[in-house]
Amino acid sequence: MQQNFAQKQMSKVFDGKTKIVFLGLDFTQAKFIGEEGFKDPYKLKTYYLSNWNALLEEEYAKYNLPLNSLKARHYETNTSDLMVLNDAIEDIEDAIINGSHYIDEKDVQKAVRKYKLSDNKGIGVSFVVESFNSSLEKAVVWVTFVSMSNGSLLYTERMEGKAEGFGLRNFWA
């Protein structure tokens, strides 16, 4: 039954009529790999987590987001709900590691269950961050579709991308 609901909701993503809400980057499952690339945990939490979301919200057309191809007439961005979760991350120092880090669909589901969405119409899209790896210059995120009406996970897929840009903020955007 849940799968039928998810399939029906996901078909709406491509109909051009359903409101699509970009929810932002969810860092609750993330690790920042390569201590040399992330030297200031305080600034990472208090500046970069919110600024990466703000950058994607304000300049989404500039970035190659998968959402740009959905042709939604009712496209919005609202990163404030996820920023509450990102702001609540404790011990950001523990998120900076040398090594590897992987999450799976169960971890994404765990993250989505914590979403308290202020809007209840349409389909939300979040990027659940698995890792920003400064050694490999690679970002790994789970592109995640969520029902705004009940917060259920509709679909998620792991994606990797090369980090590039000038300065730490733009490098990871």
Which residues does each predicted region cover?
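A structural "domain/chain start" motif
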Residues: Q2-A95
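Generic structural hydrophobic/aromatic packing signal, biased to beta-strands
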Residues: I20-L23, V143-F145, G151-E157
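Solvent-exposed loop/turn segments at secondary-structure junctions
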Residues: F27-A30, E130-S135, G161-E164
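Short, low-complexity, polar/charged sequence segments that are solvent-exposed and flexible
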Residues: K39-K45, T144-M148, K162-A163
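Surface-exposed short loop/turn segments
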Residues: L85-S149
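Short secondary-structure boundary motifs at beta->alpha junctions and helix caps
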Residues: S149-A173
